[in-house]
Amino acid sequence: MRLHTGEKPYHCFHCDRHFVQVANLRRHLRVHTGERPYSCTLCPSR
């Protein structure tokens, strides 16, 4: 129901972004940490 109410309880401590789902916050935090958990299947890059 948060989607319909506009409630965004999960916020980033590095910037001013807020999220409805904690999974979206975790994905966003990779922007700040530089984490790249998935590797390319065609080359050795991440």
Curated annotation (Swiss-Prot):
Q: PROSITE patterns from the entry?
A: ZINC_FINGER_C2H2_1 (PS00028), ZINC_FINGER_C2H2_2 (PS50157)
What are the record keywords, sorted? Developmental protein, DNA-binding, Gap protein, Metal-binding, Nucleus, Repeat, Zinc, Zinc-finger
Gene3D superfamilies, sorted: Classic Zinc Finger
Top-level lineage group = Eukaryota
Please give the function described in this protein's UniProt entry.
Krueppel is a gap class segmentation protein.
The UniProt family comment states: Belongs to the krueppel C2H2-type zinc-finger protein family.
User: What name does UniProt use for this protein?
Assistant: Protein krueppel
Q: What species is this protein from?
A: Cupiennius salei (American wandering spider)
